[in-house]
Structure formats: structure tokens, C-alpha cells
């Protein structure tokens, strides 16, 4: 009977202890990040967990798609967008903590071709992109109505007088990485992506860089989300502006803002 009593007491102690142990385990920080951030954020997440013990889980897609998911209640702690518009959209809907929002990175907009391509294109020359596409080629871009890279591309094409000759020859994709893949696989002779995307894929080469004044400045804002109840969220957002994190982003082809 004494042995039974001992095990009963031990079981009670264990049951009381389990919730404490579970809460002591660090919950991962969930980040919704623009597709163009994949390599850099994968590396940053690994570095942060190694330094702090806090795991980071990142989901990638077009900023537009991620913002809509957050608006609909998808569980996330941090939003890392490829443009200001979608971050502003969430902030206007009260879903972002303004005090924990930072304009962290910049990028360039480039015209890419498969690495084996011999094409040379001056995007300032009238009709140059349409001519380079040939008779049946299509220009790979992100969706021009919603995907940040697609919107930047459309603005640059209009500014440089190329839009009318290529607007009916666009292969619009759900994200900038999907557009990059079309070029990488040789399914499109040309595409418009970020400079960091081109650096991430050895199967493409940069044909031209669009002038900075042909489109709005490319800015990547990051922010903690209002509905996050993860105590590690603020620390992670702050760490993204640290020297170790900035070194990762710079190495991957991004320019630094803050």
C-alpha cells in the first residue's frame, strides 16, 4: 500500500510539472516573408536560433498573398514585405505594431536571361525588350496588379516607354521567384526580378539594371504583428537590424536601410 501511495504522489507531481516544462520550451517565432527573401531569411533563422535558442519558422510567398492571409487571421508573429504598400495596408487595418516596424532593406530591379543566352538589351532603347523577346517569347514578371516585383516592373516599363510593346506578352507569375524560375528553366527568354534574385540563381544572368528613377524605391519593411502573443517576437524583429543579420542580407545582394 505504501508503494501504491508513493507512485500516486509521484504521478501527481509529474502532472503538475508537465505544464511548467511545456511552457518553458521556447515557442518558435513565425515569420511571413516575401519570396525574394528566402535564402537570406533561411540563413538568418538558423543564425538566430543558434545564437538565442529560439527557433524561427518562415513561410514564403508574394507579399500580397501573405498580407491577405494575415488579414484573414493566419497565425504569424512577423511580416517581412517586399514593398511598403502591403505593410501600410496591414497597418491601416490595425494589424501591425507601428513601434516595431522598420524599413530594413533595399534592392535593385534587373532584366535577366538564361545564363546561356547571348541577348544584350538596353531597356532605354525604344522597343528593345520586345525585339529581344523574338516572335513568340514572353517576358516573365510577377503579377503586375499585386506582386511588388510585378508592380515595380510595370512602372519601369511604362517609364522607359516599353510597356505598349510588351504588355500583351507578359508571363505574369504568383511571385517574383516563380517569374525567376521561368527564366531559369528557359521557358521565358527574359524576366524582370530583383537583383538579389539574380544573385541567388546561377542559371540566369543580368542583362540590364533598370534605372532607380524608373520605379519607386524598392523598400523591404519588417514589423511585429499586433496579434502575436509570442514574447520572443520583439527581440527577433530587433535582431534583424543587428550587424550579424545585416551581414547576411548584404551578402545576399540587398542594400541596407536602417
Curated annotation (Swiss-Prot):
GO terms for cellular component: outer membrane-bounded periplasmic space. The keyword Transport applies. It comes from the Bacteria. Residues 1-22 form the signal peptide. GO terms for biological process: molybdate ion transport. GO terms for molecular function: metal ion binding; molybdate ion binding; tungstate binding. Molybdate binds at residues 36, 63, 149, 176, 194. This is Molybdate-binding protein ModA. It comes from Xanthomonas axonopodis pv. citri (strain 306). The gene is modA.
Amino acid at each position: 500500500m505504501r508503494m501504491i501511495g508513493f507512485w500516486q504522489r509521484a504521478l501527481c507531481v509529474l502532472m503538475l510539472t508537465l505544464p511548467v516544462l511545456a511552457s518553458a520550451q521556447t515557442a518558435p517565432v513565425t515569420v511571413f516573408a516575401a519570396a525574394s527573401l528566402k535564402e537570406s531569411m533561411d540563413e538568418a533563422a538558423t543564425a538566430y536560433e543558434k545564437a538565442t535558442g529560439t527557433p524561427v519558422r518562415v513561410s514564403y510567398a508574394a507579399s500580397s498573398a501573405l498580407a491577405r492571409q494575415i488579414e484573414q487571421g493566419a497565425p504569424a508573429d512577423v511580416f517581412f514585405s517586399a514593398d511598403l504598400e502591403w505593410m501600410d495596408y496591414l497597418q491601416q487595418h490595425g494589424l501591425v505594431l507601428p513601434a516595431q516596424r522598420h524599413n530594413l532593406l533595399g534592392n535593385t530591379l534587373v532584366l535577366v536571361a538564361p545564363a546561356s543566352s547571348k541577348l544584350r538589351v538596353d531597356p532605354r532603347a525604344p522597343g528593345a525588350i520586345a525585339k529581344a523577346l523574338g516572335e513568340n517569347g514572353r517576358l516573365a514578371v510577377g503579377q503586375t496588379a499585386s506582386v511588388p516585383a510585378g508592380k515595380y516592373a510595370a512602372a519601369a516599363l511604362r517609364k522607359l516607354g516599353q510597356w505598349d510593346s510588351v504588355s500583351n506578352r507578359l508571363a505574369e507569375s504568383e511571385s517574383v521567384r516563380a517569374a525567376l524560375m521561368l527564366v531559369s528553366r528557359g521557358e521565358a527568354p527574359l524576366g524582370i526580378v530583383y537583383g538579389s534574385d539574380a544573385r541567388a540563381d546561377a542559371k540566369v544572368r543580368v542583362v540590364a539594371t533598370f534605372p532607380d528613377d524608373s520605379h519607386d524605391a524598392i523598400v523591404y519593411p519588417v514589423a511585429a504583428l499586433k496579434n502575436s502573443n509570442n514574447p520572443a517576437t520583439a527581440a527577433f524583429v530587433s535582431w534583424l537590424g543587428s550587424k550579424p543579420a545585416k551581414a547576411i542580407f548584404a551578402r545576399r545582394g540587398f542594400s541596407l536601410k536602417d
